[in-house]
Amino acid sequence: MKDITTWIDEYQKGSRFGLKGKVLLKKNSKFQEILIIESDYYGKALMLDRCWMTSMRDEKYYHECLVHPALSSIKEKSRILIIGGGDGGTARECLKYSQVEKIDLVEIDEEVIKASKKFLQEIGGTAWIDKRLTIHIDDGVKWVEKAKNNFYDCIFIDCSDPSEFSNLLFTDTFYKECKRILTQKGILATQSESPESFKNIHIHILKSLKKVFKLSETMYSFVPIYPSGIWSWTFASKGELNLSTPCCNEVTTIEKGCDIWNLNFQNAAFKMMPNKIVKELNS
């Protein structure tokens, strides 16, 4: 790969979001184009099909917001399922909890994991060698369909934006299957897109989860390299869902190890739903 510094951009609806840097890896897998760059400001970053997935500088905005509201709010968290998550960041955050005994990480594209292990070592960290983590190169939808009833305490949907091979992860049918394999007091956590750049998808996810699950709540925060900068995560349960009061005696220790997440941050983020989204959900 030539040592050339240039602008690498993601294009969305007449807008572009770019980082200046050098391309370290450009590879086409069976599913998508994988691009790793070394950027001037955000460090190493991952693109899939020319969409930003993560960067060294801002990845904790995403991973900490996806994981900790869920795991801090449930008592039982021994069995965890991650759909996607090939950069290793979600697994890393989950493994901070001593109660976690087993994580199944189901990633459809093995090349994403290989690229992340080679170029984004700091994101996955020691998660890749933790014996509690088992990696499965498989289709997440099919994995969920085959899983036992009431098996997982927490399911994380850490996937890319809807595409030819990920569209089924955003359907009522898939959410119903996730509900089936969750324990009664378990929780589902999913990235739920941007209320600005991907408003229609965002609304669809929120409405689908409200339809399928008894309870669901959405929080908003920032992921600087994502289109518009504002992002969301939605949490759903078929039983209890108390996201304001932690059920975990490790919270204080975990807060100290986080760059972004703490309970005050979380509680404020759950109150940030834009009014235009409120009106659409109530229409």
Curated annotation (Swiss-Prot):
GO terms for molecular function: spermidine synthase activity. One of its GO terms (biological process) is spermidine biosynthetic process. Pfam families: Spermine_synt_N (PF17284), Spermine_synth (PF01564). The active site is at D158. It is found in: Cytoplasm. The keyword Endoplasmic reticulum does not apply. Its EC number is 2.5.1.16. SUPFAM superfamilies: S-adenosyl-L-methionine-dependent methyltransferases. Pathway: Amine and polyamine biosynthesis; spermidine biosynthesis; spermidine from putrescine: step 1/1. Belongs to the spermidine/spermine synthase family. This is Polyamine aminopropyltransferase.
